[in-house]
Amino acid sequence: MKSEVPIVLNTELSEREIFLIGSIVSQWGFLESDIFEQTLLSFEDGEDLPASMNNAQFSSVLKLWMERVANKQDGARQAVLKAQYDEILYLSDFRQAVVHSRWDWRPDTPDEITAVRVHKKSVKRVKFTGDELADFSTRLGQVRYRIRYPGGPEDRATELAESGGYISRRGFEFLFGRAQLPDLRDD
């Protein structure tokens, strides 16, 4: 039996760019889930859920989260959550570019990639460097942390104390010898 080598098209993205785009997509997915879960927990058992909780459009769930979760907090916690809401709105256009575009690059600017898409009958182009993608991913991680722990490290410590502790996937793999050193690095 003859073995065929699969023929595939290259994305023309570097390994770092592929990793960072994947990180952004993953972080945003978790962000949407965090917002949805917090909003869902704001409803009483048996209470009718609004159509926005069908989770078909994140912007609708986000508005409901602002109303039912963020605006119900006191003082500093409310300020932290409102700031995250503003950051999510700001980052949303970049997320759309990352997720819904075809990527392009030019030989005269090899350290830059351009996300190209059609939106509302116009062509949109957003340029990114690897460092900008890394910054975007980090900002999303920070937003997620602040949404889950608006009181900061004290909230995280309380959660850990109440749950009896936690070990990350990386920690688990490291302890049980399943991870390779390159898998544990973020660079």
Predicted segments, located by residue:
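Short, flexible loop segments at the rims of nucleotide/cofactor-binding pockets, characterized by
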Residues: D74-G75
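Acidic interhelical loop/turn segments
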Residues: W105-V123
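Short loop/turn segments that flank or connect secondary-structure elements
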Residues: V126-K127
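Amphipathic alpha-helical interface elements
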Residues: M1-R68, K82-D93, A97-D108, A134, ...
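Charged phosphate-binding loop/patch that engages nucleotide di/tri-phosphates or the phosphate backbone
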Residues: P153-D187
